[in-house]
Amino acid sequence: MATVDDILTGKYPAKSHARRVAQLLQAHHGQGAPGVIYLEAQKTRLIEDNDEPMPFRQRRFFYYLSGCSLPDSYLIYDINADKLTLFIPPIDAEEVIWSGLPLSADEAMKLYDVDCVLAATEVNATLRSIGSAYGGNAVAFAIADQVSSGAEFQGFAETKLSVLKEAIEKARVVKDEYEIALLRKANDISAKAHIAAIRASKTAVNEREIEGAFIATCIAHGAREQSYHPIVACGANGATLHYGKNDDDLTDPATKQRKNNILIDAGGEYRAYCSDITRVFPLGGSFTKETRQIYEIVLQMQLECIAMLKGDVQWEDVHAHAHRVAIKGLLALGILSGSEDELFEKRISVAFFPHGLGHYLGMDTHDTGGNPNYGDKDTMFKYLRVRGRLPVGSVITVEPGIYFCRFIIDPYTQSPELGKYINTTVLERYWMVGGVRIEDNIHITKDGHENLTTAPKAIEEMESLAL
């Protein structure tokens, strides 16, 4: 069986991606006229009022059909001829002085899964040639707001700007072997970074030191970019879902004691593919009684939900199951009172688990194709980023959590109808837990699933690493 590194020595499968997108276009928009797919890379841009370049992030639609991370590049896929052409920036003598020689066409041919590499100055001439070859009957597919003013589609019968984006988004949901290898690599690097962050917490005095340890480890192992801004939240900060300050002291100024625990939601990006991992660990080597109790519930939520995963499973059913496990656990602790079914019907668990169970993962952290319904009136499903059945080959996060956020819980406790279901006396002991979320990245297979995340999560492992 080929290893991850063996797979990644090959070329990114841009040509097969182009064919897949073309098939989706033809399936939904007819097999009639010949067509071309036209995509542009992200442009080089300067920071406003500055001569420094903005941090570069390649357009994901362009990358999916090229595997190319060069800015100011272009791509044309002639669907009928099955010819994929990449256009890269030509040599600029003045730029060479500052940045060195750019990638040559010959070098690009060796790197990328394309049929031809030309200079970016040849884009319009190539479009005219293709349009002429098809006698003016060809259709050009491009993405609105991602076409330069200088692009010329002369000789084409029509330019469609509203269908290509949707086709690529749909194609990206199902990953091939190469993409799974990239996601696995990103996860492996991030697992090392999570362990490094836990170890750094032993001597750290501020959240930013732990964030620094995570990022440094990612860079050292080849993941120079982060999938998203890391979340490093100590104590009650963990109750904020997308906490981003990462600058709080690990010692409580009132008690002069180290805070209970830290939630880290962070993932490195490897060759444009993301990881998204969340772990919670104790400061000082041992979870408090209350944090351990909540951790056990959340871990049970995650393990049971992962066990349900296989091709064609209904994601809403998995999400609902997570809520039922949460209700059962919070009932056992005395935080909730009532019957499991009544608490579920009243959506009381949403006060503690307000977000969706997970989202697709790929080149974007919240990857394409999830079809969310943020207008859903049902609070349990409103923020569920994926709706429907999970296809074989998709990769999804499973990230249940329980949070103690007054802003969310107080409206429930103060409600004449819902307040009776929450025991505020017992609840008082759990506010300083903040939040517990455990997140892994799961590859959906025909008969089951594969967990791409190797970072430790058992209570004993987390305490041992933090000791």
Swiss-Prot record:
CDD domains linked to this entry: Prolidase (cd01087)
Reaction(s) this enzyme catalyzes, per UniProt: Release of any N-terminal amino acid, including proline, that is linked to proline, even from a dipeptide or tripeptide
Binding positions (Mn(2+) 1): D276, E399, E439
Needed co-factor(s): Mn(2+)
Keyword terms, alphabetized: Aminopeptidase, Hydrolase, Manganese, Metal-binding, Metalloprotease, Protease
Chain residues that bind Mn(2+) 2: D265, D276, E439
Alphabetized PANTHER family for the sequence: XAA-PRO AMINOPEPTIDASE 3, XAA-PRO DIPEPTIDASE
Its job: Catalyzes the removal of a penultimate prolyl residue from the N-termini of peptides.
UniProt record similarity statement: Belongs to the peptidase M24B family.
Record-given protein name: Probable Xaa-Pro aminopeptidase pepP
Biological classification of the source: Eukaryota, Fungi, Dikarya, Ascomycota, Pezizomycotina
The gene coding this protein: pepP
